[in-house]
């Protein structure tokens, strides 16, 4: 009988789902198996050897056992280096008393892809800085294997949430003629020609900084929509939380106010956390053991917390009270209208609320032109979700649906040119609507405990020189 080609993940799933009575049938059907993967470790004592093989189908490895009395090419296999690609035929044997529930006893093997002895990923601890220098190889390291599995799972969880809630997925353009945030930090696009800035599109264009302005018109046709894609900002911010290319999740909901917006943010975040804790067990156990030993407790706390709501004004009052009582911030000058720093946000969520909190109703000068002005004339219906140990995680707002108010605000900030079409959406059947943005990479940092945005992106793009 030909050996059955199997994935390691399928074997783990089969064994986990069966009881003892069905084990014999499984073993009979998988008596001899064919597996392919990459060597994580290889050790032997001269008579018996052990290889940890990962085939890419799951985070777990499978243990290959090779015996000198059984395998003719024992010496050859014992000298196979970490990182080599291997094809193996062997017998599947259950090992209920060992760390792993099964092993494969090698009968035949083929060295599919040898590896040079100078392979950078040897069996030892490597610094994150070193691993960033070999971004093309680091997916094979345990940490990044787990990170990119989680990146995939988080992306699917986002789509799952919005699709289950009846949202339509909209593809917004990467090339745009506007700067949605009005900050001017865009990457211009040029062509070869006499007028490289304008020859192709007839005007200056850039890579998008946000899909929001382009997804809003679709909310006014399909009610609930979202976009999920890459965005670009030419900021020279050499921090652990900033990148020049990153992914954004940006939903928009018609006939929704700020409270509806916050309800959706809370539900979305809790869904992502729930999926991580209950469907990504191996990866989460790894992160909790080796990256952040408080990770699972923190996520469980957020999952089961009520997200409180506090006005920006109340937050300023709490910070002023803290300073008066002797608390020292790096920026101790607290005043209404200031842009809160991470230390202030963390104080509010960790010391005052002791849990997740939405800060709402910010001064309008601090926020984008499209946010709905409140009746006081000083604030806008905006919200930022603050979570312990991170600070701001999500930003959202009710959008200004009143044509005259929005037009006046756009004229005040000088962004009318090129956005006449955006104003049209308020002239022709506009309605109250709200939306928010989640930085996908920062969300991934939060769920994994990773401390640098460069370590949750496959090939990070920052203001550093590009190698890949």
Question: What are these model-derived regions, one by one?
Answer:
Residues 151, 258-266:
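Short, charged, low-complexity patches
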Residues 255-259, 278-280:
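Inter-helical turn/loop segments and adjacent helix faces that build the functional surface
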Residues 78, 150, 179, 183, ...:
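Secondary-structure capping and boundary motifs in well-ordered enzyme cores
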Residues 220-230, 243-257, 272, 354-468:
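TRNA-recognition modules of translation machinery and tRNA-sensing kinases, especially anticodon-binding
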Residues 38, 80, 156-165, 210-213, ...:
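Generic, well-ordered alpha-helical scaffold segments in large soluble proteins
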Residues 2-18, 24-254:
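Class II aminoacyl-tRNA synthetase-like tRNA-binding/catalytic domains
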Residues 180-186, 193-194, 267-387, 412-413, ...:
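Metal-assisted phosphate- and nucleotidyl-transfer catalytic regions
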Residues 120-122, 151, 168-175, 229-230, ...:
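Short coil/turn segments at secondary-structure boundaries
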């Amino acid at each position: 009988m030909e050996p059955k080609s199997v994935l390691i993940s399928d074997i783990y799933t089969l064994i986990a789902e069966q009881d003892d009575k069905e084990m014999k049938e499984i073993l009979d059907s998988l008596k001899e198996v064919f597996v392919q993967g990459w060597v994580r470790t290889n050790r032997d004592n001269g008579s018996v050897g052990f290889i940890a093989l990962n085939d890419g189908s799951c985070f777990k490895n499978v243990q290959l056992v090779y015996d000198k009395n059984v395998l003719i090419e024992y010496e050859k296999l014992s000298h196979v280096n970490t990182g080599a690609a291997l094809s193996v035929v062997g017998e599947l044997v259950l090992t209920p008393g060992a760390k792993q529930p099964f092993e494969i006893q090698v009968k035949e093997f083929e060295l599919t892809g040898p590896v040079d002895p100078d392979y950078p990923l040897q069996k030892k601890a490597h610094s994150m800085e070193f691993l960033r220098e070999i971004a093309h190889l680091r997916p094979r390291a345990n940490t990044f294997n787990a990170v990119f599995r989680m990146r995939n799972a988080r992306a699917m969880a986002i789509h799952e949430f919005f699709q289950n809630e009846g949202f339509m997925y909209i593809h917004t353009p990467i090339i745009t003629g506007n700067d949605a945030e009005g900050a001017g930090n865009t990457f211009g696009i040029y062509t070869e020609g006499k007028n490289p800035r304008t020859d192709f599109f007839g005007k200056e264009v850039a890579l998008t900084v946000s899909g929001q302005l382009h997804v809003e018109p679709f909310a006014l046709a399909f009610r609930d929509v979202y976009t999920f894609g890459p965005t670009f900002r030419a900021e020279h911010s050499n921090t652990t939380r900033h990148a020049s290319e990153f992914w954004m999740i940006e939903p928009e909901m018609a006939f929704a106010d700020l409270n509806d917006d916050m309800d959706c943010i809370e539900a979305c975040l809790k869904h992502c956390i729930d999926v991580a804790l209950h469907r990504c067990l191996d990866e989460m156990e790894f992160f909790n053991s080796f990256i952040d030993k408080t990770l699972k407790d923190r996520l469980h706390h957020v999952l089961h917390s009520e997200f409180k709501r506090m006005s920006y004004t109340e937050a300023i009052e709490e910070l002023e009270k803290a300073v008066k009582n002797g608390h020292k911030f790096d920026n101790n000058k607290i005043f209404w209208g200031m842009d809160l720093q991470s230390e202030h946000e963390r104080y509010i969520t960790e010391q005052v609320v002791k849990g997740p909190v939405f800060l709402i109703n910010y001064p309008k000068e601090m926020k984008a032109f499209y946010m709905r002005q409140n009746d006081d004339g000083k604030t806008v219906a905006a919200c930022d979700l603050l979570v312990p140990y991170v600070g701001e995680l999500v930003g959202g707002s009710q959008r200004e649906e009143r044509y005259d108010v929005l037009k006046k605000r756009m004229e005040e900030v000088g962004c009318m040119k090129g956005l006449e079409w955006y104003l049209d959406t308020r002239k022709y059947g506009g309605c109250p609507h709200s939306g928010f943005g989640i930085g996908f990479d920062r969300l991934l940092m939060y769920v994994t405990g990773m401390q640098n945005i460069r370590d949750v992106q496959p090939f990070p793009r920052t203001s550093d020189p590009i190698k890949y």
